[in-house]
Amino acid sequence: MSLVARTGLIVVFIILGTGHIGAQTATLSGDLLTDWQTQKRTMLAIADAMPEELFGFKPTDAQRTYAEQVLHIAGANVYLMQHLAGGVEAPAVDTTDFSTFGLEATSKAVVLEALAEGYDYGIAVLQEFSDEELVATVSGPRYLGEVTRVRMAYFTLSHAMDIYGQMAVYLRLNGVTPPASRRGGV
């Protein structure tokens, strides 16, 4: 192999190795915060996709309205993230009302504001913790028991995605394509 070819290979390995080192600097807290912020944008987009006049739509009498689905996420985010035992003051929610957590849908703007506030609270809480603190155990809700902070945060994210799936159906039943489907999905 010529000197030029060997030098070229060495340069390629150095570049690849440097990229790998950069990838190793990711942190649990950084990844979790990124996931939370990404989900905030995703949920605000799907919440905003429904026209305001259809915020009262529900597929059956037994289900929540579209606005109530959004408020459920907003309130659940606050309720669940309070279990991380952070020092940030939480927005007021009624923890005896697991449907909307006492939040009311007086307008689309109010609903979207509540959703953003719930996510902003989660962001503020997550910013308090280091990687080591995220793996510490806290008391979760009774149905989870003792959990790590990171599990509690990811449980909260997965709960919201469950509701996202329901909201996508609400949109399609009203002829609206969910935002993620407009851009080709995942």
Where are the predicted features?
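Bacterial N-terminal signal peptides that target proteins for export
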Residues: M1-L9
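Bacterial N-terminal signal peptides
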Residues: G8-H20
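Boundary at the C-terminal end of the N-terminal hydrophobic targeting segment
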Residues: I21-T25
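Short, contiguous alpha-helical
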Residues: L33-Q37, R41-L44, L54-D97, S139-V186
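Well-ordered alpha-helical scaffold segments within catalytic/enzyme domains
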Residues: T42, I46-D48, M81, Y121, ...
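Surface-exposed helix-capping loop/turn segments at secondary-structure junctions
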Residues: A49-G56, V125-V135, L173-P178
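Acidic/histidine-rich alpha-helical segments that form the ligand environment
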Residues: T100-G140, T148-H159
